Amino acid sequence: MTEAKTPRRRNLLKGAAVAAGAISAPMIAKAQTGPISMRWQSTWPAKDIFHEYALDYAKKVNDMTGGDLKIEVLPAGAVVPAFGLLEAVSKGTLDGGHGVLGYHYGKQNALALWNSGPAFGMDANMILAWHKYGGGAELLAKLYASIGGNVQSFLYGPMSTQPLGWFKKPITKSSDFKGLKFRTNGLAIDLFTAMGAAVNALP
């Protein structure tokens, strides 16, 4: 990132709670000379639809600023692994990130409240409303601070609860989950682990 006389930066994490998009970018404290360049990374592969969302966002920002702000969005793994994005943005290794808040579940499990969880509780639009009008944004800032997250999160792009899954054998009773290899994230990790599933928390 090109900077002139910017001794201190604060990184913003633009996150997609309950959704699939978290974007991070630093706020510049003083005036810049020339275009500002930012390097972001997503938690998604290059061909993933959610990575395309991040690219679309960056293009809109670039166009709106008339080229004064140039955001480059890299795919997952280009600089850090998907689950290393929060730390990379906090430390300034990257200027921004696009992912899902639930991916930080291992650092602070309460962050899963903003993720698409099991099939009960608030839906995605309810979570966004709670975040904006019900104190969710303030709670999120405290949770990030509790794990040393030097980021500011912006939520967008609601996603409904993830489908249960696609299985080789029919699931007809709860005991069928015992020993079953199952991919999920957020609060669903604890739920299906308690049911005996072998859960993988993959991006």
Task: List each language-model region with its residue ranges.
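N-terminal secretory signal peptides
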Residues: 1-7, 20-22
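Contiguous mixed-secondary-structure segments that line small-molecule binding/active-site clefts
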Residues: 2-3, 59, 90, 100-202
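N-terminal export signals
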Residues: 11-31
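Immediate post-signal peptide segment of exported/extracytoplasmic ligand-binding proteins
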Residues: 25-42, 63-70, 170-181
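Extracytoplasmic "Venus flytrap"
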Residues: 39-56, 76-80
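Short, polar/charged alpha-helical segment
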Residues: 47-72, 190
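Extracytoplasmic small-molecule ligand-binding "clamshell" domains
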Residues: 71-89
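Short, Asp-centered acidic motifs that coordinate Mg2+ and/or phosphate
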Residues: 95-96
